[in-house]
């Protein structure tokens, strides 16, 4: 259900960004660079960053198709981070899972050995808590 793999898919849950649809020679036409993302409170993303507005680095041309967003939210998917300017889904979570967080951006591009990305720290912390019952 992704137009990245099947451009004639009946249900393009993941679809090419509208700004990319008319471009024939894709080349370096991706959404590249650092973009703002607004987080909702009481989410794993917010708990990880400790703030409502973040900036993260991107390298892609496909996005969650907002046409399907409410259907996923009705089944328990939490859209915890969005780019308000373009109305793009940036982070999703499954609230009932100990730590299911998926991002559209690349947190590894802002992580360093001596300064791990907030999402990586949070993920490792959740793994330790799951195994040992505490941090």
Predicted features, each with a name:
Residues 1-135:
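Amide-donor transfer/coupling interface in amidating biosynthetic enzymes
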């Amino acid at each position: 259900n992704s137009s990245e793999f099947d451009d004639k898919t009946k249900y393009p849950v993941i679809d090419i960004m509208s700004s990319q649809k008319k471009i024939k020679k894709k080349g370096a036409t991706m959404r590249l660079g650092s973009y703002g993302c607004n987080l909702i409170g009481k989410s794993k993303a917010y708990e990880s960053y400790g703030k409502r507005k973040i900036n993260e680095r991107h390298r892609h041309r496909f996005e969650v198709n907002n046409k399907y967003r409410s259907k996923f939210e009705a089944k328990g998917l939490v859209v915890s981070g969005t780019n308000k300017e373009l109305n793009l889904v940036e982070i999703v979570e499954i609230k009932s899972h100990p730590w299911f967080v998926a991002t559209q951006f690349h947190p590894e591009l802002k992580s360093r050995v001596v300064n791990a990305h907030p999402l990586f720290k949070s993920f490792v912390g959740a793994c330790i808590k799951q195994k040992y019952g505490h941090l």
